[in-house]
């Protein structure tokens, strides 16, 4: 692929917005969860989580082990890789409108739950790479050719070997490509073939990853327990409902202020936009009922892939970092607004910018809270150390 001037401008704008959004992390990134252990011992350890490609990448960039703490370099590299991946699909989804493309694609990072992913000193690189590769994989497969299905399957294995939750991003971008074709009035037969190709690439890659990698590498009671699927019996429906309610409680806990009504407004904007898109698509179209049904299915699927297959797990991980799909959903909402109201670009851009502003304020507050928590924990550890020394424990 050759980068034109619009691609270069898009990458510049996107990286500028990303730097503003992640500025506290780029200037001072605290140790988060697994970071401290890796900084102390220089170990890898991602393979046991079913993420061997993460081990491989850090082994290569560190020229072996022990791995070093090069923060914020992993985060910077991750954002750049994501920007490059998005530039590959910018023209298909947005044409020459690189400004709106930058604002919409920023929703992937501006996802309030993605703050946890970006906060890791090490994993921020591989998690961003996983999202980037999943987007490219979805795009490659959405072109009906046998070779593209093979390439997509390989890329699917790659992004699952980096971070499994990016599967939802693959699915939501597939929906984005479908709605793009609906707006461009592509034939139902072409849309169906491309969709089938994309689904095939995902399924083949997923089963190959599950059998050849996850089945052989995932170790530890924690990893094994959280990867179990709900048994197909009388408690199946009850388990799914329980998972949905648990994720809903997490949503409502994090997005519980008046300022965060802006995120809920995206859902209503999506519905209105899809109605407008349907009315435009079925005007003088012979496949009115088919396209109406397709758009309804797209709406339901976009909401499902906020959580995705995790609702079928016996003990899913209830943590913000697994909700990468929320960023994809936010992007999809903005994309539909863009398609529905192309003649009102200024209003759309103002709306998208306001969402980014709220998200940036939220992220700065979250980063400060993480930093304050780390300082508190550091203070407690220092006091314990001083007490131990004062009492004489450990002396010969």
Whereabouts are the PLM-identified features?
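Membrane-lumen/periplasm interface segments of specific transmembrane helices
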Residues: 194-272, 310
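Perimembrane helix-loop-helix junctions
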Residues: 170-200
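Membrane-interface alpha helices of multi-pass inner-membrane proteins
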Residues: 149-164, 169-170, 175
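Signature aromatic-anchored transmembrane alpha helix within multi-pass, membrane-resident enzymes
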Residues: 147-150, 339-363
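Membrane-embedded, lumen/periplasm-facing catalytic core of multi-pass transferases
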Residues: 358-396
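Extracytoplasmic catalytic/substrate-binding loops of multi-pass membrane glycan-assembly enzymes
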Residues: 21-38, 45-57, 375-376
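Membrane-interface micro-motifs in multi-pass membrane enzymes
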Residues: 47, 51, 78, 99-142, ...
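Membrane-interface transmembrane helices that cradle and orient dolichyl/undecaprenyl
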Residues: 134-149, 183-185
């Amino acid at each position: 692929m050759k980068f034109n001037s619009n691609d270069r401008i898009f990458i510049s704008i996107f990286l500028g917005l990303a730097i503003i959004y992640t500025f506290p992390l780029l200037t001072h990134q605290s140790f988060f969860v697994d970071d401290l252990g890796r900084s102390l011992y220089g170990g890898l350890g991602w393979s046991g989580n079913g993420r061997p490609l993460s081990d491989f990448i850090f082994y290569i960039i560190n020229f072996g082990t022990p791995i070093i703490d090069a923060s914020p370099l992993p985060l910077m590299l991750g954002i750049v890789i994501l920007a490059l991946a998005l530039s590959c699909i910018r023209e298909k989804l947005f044409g020459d409108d690189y400004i709106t493309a930058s604002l919409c694609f920023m929703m992937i990072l501006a996802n309030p739950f993605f703050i946890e992913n970006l906060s890791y000193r090490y994993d921020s690189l591989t998690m961003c790479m996983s999202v980037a590769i999943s987007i490219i994989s979805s795009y490659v497969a959405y072109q009906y050719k046998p070779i593209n299905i093979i390439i997509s399957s390989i890329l699917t294995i790659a992004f699952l070997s980096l971070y499994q939750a990016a599967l939802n991003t693959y699915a939501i971008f597939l929906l984005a490509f479908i709605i793009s074709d609906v707006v461009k009035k592509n034939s139902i037969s072409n849309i169906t073939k491309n969709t089938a190709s994309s689904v095939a690439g995902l399924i083949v890659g997923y089963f190959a990853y599950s059998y050849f990698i996850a089945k052989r590498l995932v170790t530890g009671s924690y990893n094994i327990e959280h990867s179990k699927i709900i048994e197909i019996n009388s408690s199946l429906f009850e388990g799914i409902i329980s998972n949905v309610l648990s994720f809903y409680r997490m949503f409502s806990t994090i997005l519980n202020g008046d300022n965060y009504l802006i995120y809920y407004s995206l859902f209503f904007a999506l519905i209105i936009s899809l109605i407008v898109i349907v009315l435009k698509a079925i005007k003088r179209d012979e496949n009115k009922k088919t396209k109406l049904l397709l758009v309804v299915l797209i709406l339901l699927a976009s909401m499902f892939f906020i959580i995705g297959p995790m609702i079928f797990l016996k003990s899913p991980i209830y943590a913000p970092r697994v909700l990468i799909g929320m960023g994809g959903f936010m992007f999809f909402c903005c994309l539909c607004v863009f398609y529905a109201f192309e003649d009102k670009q200024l209003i759309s851009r103002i709306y998208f910018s306001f969402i980014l502003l709220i998200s940036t304020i939220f992220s700065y507050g979250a980063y400060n809270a993480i930093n304050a928590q780390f300082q508190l924990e550091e203070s407690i550890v220092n006091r314990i150390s001083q007490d131990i020394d004062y009492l004489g424990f450990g002396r010969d």
